[in-house]
């Protein structure tokens, strides 16, 4: 039987998540709190950690590159990230995504996959 990985939202209440994101932003104002989780059907390994403090001026492309290296993906394997079921432009800055898509708990939620389409 496979290990069931609970999502970040299932592990912590909305109040706990809001308190944590507020603490992170107060302590690291130049960074944004990002939760990245594997799309359920993705043929990829789970990451050891799913919570990242990302520089506000980092591009989505740089973030994807960092995730690929962290997962030690074969360079021939493409990695895609989604925000609210949308594939963001790789040139987009993370702070722009955060300002547009952050959730009420103060985190930006993303998922990753090897497929370019969601669903």
UniProtKB/Swiss-Prot annotation:
GO terms for biological process: autophagy; protein transport. Induction: Induced by sugar starvation. It is a lipid-anchor. Interacts with ATG4. Interacts with ATI1. Pfam families: ATG8. Keywords: Autophagy, Cytoplasm, Cytoplasmic vesicle, Cytoskeleton, Lipoprotein, Membrane, Microtubule, Protein transport, Transport, Ubl conjugation pathway, Vacuole. PANTHER family: MICROTUBULE-ASSOCIATED PROTEINS 1A/1B LIGHT CHAIN 3-RELATED (PTHR10969). It is found in: Cytoplasmic vesicle, Autophagosome membrane; Vacuole membrane; Cytoplasm, Cytoskeleton. Ubiquitin-like modifier involved in autophagosomes formation. May mediate the delivery of the autophagosomes to the vacuole via the microtubule cytoskeleton. Belongs to the ATG8 family. It comes from the Eukaryota. Constitutively expressed. Its main location: membrane. Gly-119 forms then a thioester bond with the 'Cys-558' of ATG7 (E1-like activating enzyme) before being transferred to the 'Cys-258' of ATG3 (the specific E2 conjugating enzyme), in order to be finally amidated with phosphatidylethanolamine. This lipid modification anchors ATG8 to autophagosomes. This is Autophagy-related protein 8h. A lipid is attached at residue 119 (Phosphatidylethanolamine amidated glycine). GO terms for cellular component: autophagosome; autophagosome membrane; cytoplasmic vesicle; microtubule.
């Amino acid at each position: 039987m496979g290990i069931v990985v609970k999502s970040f939202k299932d592990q912590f209440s909305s109040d706990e998540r809001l308190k944590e994101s507020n603490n992170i932003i107060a302590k690291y104002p130049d960074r944004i709190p990002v939760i990245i989780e594997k799309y359920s059907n993705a043929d990829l390994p789970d990451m050891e950690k799913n919570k990242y403090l990302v520089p506000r001026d980092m591009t989505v492309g740089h973030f994807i590159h960092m995730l690929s290296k962290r997962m030690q993906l074969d360079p021939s394997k493409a990695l895609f990230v989604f925000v609210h079921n949308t594939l963001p432009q790789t040139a987009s800055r993370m702070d722009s995504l955060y300002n547009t898509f952050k959730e009420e708990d103060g985190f930006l939620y993303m998922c990753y996959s090897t497929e370019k389409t969601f669903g």
